[in-house]
Amino acid sequence: MRVTTSFPLGTLRDTPSEAEIISHQLLLQAGYIRRVNSGIYAYMPIMLRVIEKISAIIERELNSIGCTKLLLPQLHPADLWRKSERWEGYTAGEGIMFNLKDRQGKEFGLAPTHEEVITSIASETINSYKQLPQCFYQIQTKFRDEIRPRFGLMRSREFIMKDGYSFHSSEKDLASFYEKVGNAYENIFKSCGLETVGVEADSGAIGGASSKEFMVTADAGEDSILFTKSGSYAANIEKAVSLPSQPIPIKDNIAEWLETPHQKTILEVCDNNNLDPSQIIKVVIFLAQFEGEFEVPILACIRGDQHINEVKLFNLINKLHNFNLINLQKIEDKNTIEKNLVDFPLGFIGPDLDNKTIKASSNWVKKWTRIIDPSASELSKFISGGNKVNFHKLFQEFSFASKDYLIGDIRNAKKGDKISIANDEELKEKKGIEIGHIFQLGQKYSEKLNAKFSDKDGTLKNLWMGCYGIGVTRIAQAAIEQNHDQKGICWPIQISPFEVIIIPTNLKDPIQSELTEQIYNNFLINKIDVLLDDRNDRAGVKFKDAELIGIPFQIIIGRDSVNKEVELLSRTNNTKFKISTDKLLETFISESEIMYNKNS
């Protein structure tokens, strides 16, 4: 392709001010995307080529394990999502689904994911074990009403995603196929030139028994990954488990009541009373909001040197009740407290807080749901709030069971923690960008949407189901996070918009012009993905643009063209050497094969 006639470059000289991370800056500056609105981008021709190459790699790998491509609607009827009990959670409050009503007043949502639709189709088309297993996938635009779109294509309101769904006759078959997809994902990401790590993950709103995320390690990542040096364990921080450090015992001479005026934080109490945070139990209140406006107050207790993992807490509360949990909110504002609680000493709460603190006029359930992390429940002697303003209290041999406490892991694992009693490896931490996620959904959706099949013995059973996602546009931006320098992007050759760019320094020179056309046409004949920068701009402008857009190889045609010599430059390795034109094609093919084989 030629820059002047079919592939104009829209590079910018200045760094866009709205871009927070380097990959977002480079996508805008190199002309790959254009911002239309917050979280909404146009994919320019050069970006579309990257997306198409990533998509081709995905299709190749998924087709090789027996998956079939289809295309599902983006507009979903609310009735389907109500059957799965996800409509309220996805549309109310901070829900991420764009939703609307048509002319007849019927409700619809713009799809962030497709479990309901594909399960509905499976219920109509799969009726026998003889048709199983089956896996369908699509590559399509998705929509999410992000509260705060940021980081370009990392967290946008419209993005391209590959989502796949498999159906099975047994849990064993699902688990086997889940592993097969995981292996295919590793091949996909390697073929895209990415370094990734697979980690245990929370299943979130999609649900299911187990799930695994695939992360690109990068400083700009929004997720934290905890892992061991040996590679024996890796998990997203939302899912990670570990052993906390040992608490420091409390001295015997401490008073039963501590006057702690205006000491509402753990740090303030410790500094003023010669205590360690591990000797304190902090009590945090949350409000669990269930479908049907059912609200439950939560008392969550954890050791003072640890932090509550709200994802773990959400999942634990969701299992306790027969209703669908929509939202979990930490209660700290004065208005909410005054409306629902009486004589409530915020900042001085103890684990023995009475149910009578909940006002009779409150819409809340009139009993605290009490949850405590093992890091706190194992303390036989500790300091906590005295349920009186400006007072903390010494608790000895306190019976959490007598207060109906549920003991459960609600703690954030952190770097430096030990894995377990049997494994004393310490956790390390890195930032990561999630580019893929696979789930064993089990029978969650088939039960609710009545997707059944007839087994070998003739009995009707619910389908077993898996779900598999890849962020296509995220892969493109994550690749830039891992492959750039001070000059611009350094694309992995597999997903680069072109393999090579030809840069004549002076097209007014007839020798250069003729040689340029010869090389360009020869590369086209040999089916090499080539871009010709045939602009009449200064050579310096062309060089800068070529470095910015990041095509792996550059062929520079300059003064030595009179001797039938050109320069072949590797953007990836930052190497450059002169070569005669009769050896150029052969050398380029050899050098590019080395790059391809690196990630095959």
Curated annotation (Swiss-Prot):
Described purpose of this protein according to its UniProt entry: Catalyzes the attachment of proline to tRNA(Pro) in a two-step reaction: proline is first activated by ATP to form Pro-AMP and then transferred to the acceptor end of tRNA(Pro). As ProRS can inadvertently accommodate and process non-cognate amino acids such as alanine and cysteine, to avoid such errors it has two additional distinct editing activities against alanine. One activity is designated as 'pretransfer' editing and involves the tRNA(Pro)-independent hydrolysis of activated Ala-AMP.
Record EC number: 6.1.1.15
HAMAP family assigned: Pro_tRNA_synth_type1 (MF_01569)
Family assignment from sequence similarity: Belongs to the class-II aminoacyl-tRNA synthetase family. ProS type 1 subfamily.
Summary of subunit composition and partner proteins: Homodimer.
Cellular location(s): Cytoplasm
Record protein name field: Proline--tRNA ligase
Pfam name, any one: tRNA_edit
GO term, biological process aspect, one: prolyl-tRNA aminoacylation
GO CC term, one of those recorded: cytosol
InterPro entries according to UniProt: aa-tRNA-synt_IIb (IPR002314), aa-tRNA-synth_II (IPR006195), aa-tRNA-synth_II/BPL/LPL (IPR045864), Anticodon-bd (IPR004154), Anticodon-bd_dom_sf (IPR036621), Pro-tRNA-ligase_IIa (IPR002316), Pro-tRNA-synth_IIa_bac-type (IPR004500), Pro-tRNA-Synthase_IIa_type1 (IPR023717)
Taxonomic source organism: Prochlorococcus marinus (strain MIT 9215)
Gene that this sequence comes from: proS
Domain characteristics, as noted in the entry: Consists of three domains: the N-terminal catalytic domain, the editing domain and the C-terminal anticodon-binding domain.
Top-level taxon of the source organism: Bacteria
Catalytic reaction annotation: tRNA(Pro) + L-proline + ATP = L-prolyl-tRNA(Pro) + AMP + diphosphate
Top EC class of this enzyme: ligase
Key words, A-Z: Aminoacyl-tRNA synthetase, ATP-binding, Cytoplasm, Ligase, Nucleotide-binding, Protein biosynthesis
MF terms (GO), sorted A to Z: aminoacyl-tRNA deacylase activity; ATP binding; proline-tRNA ligase activity
Disulphide bonds in the chain: none
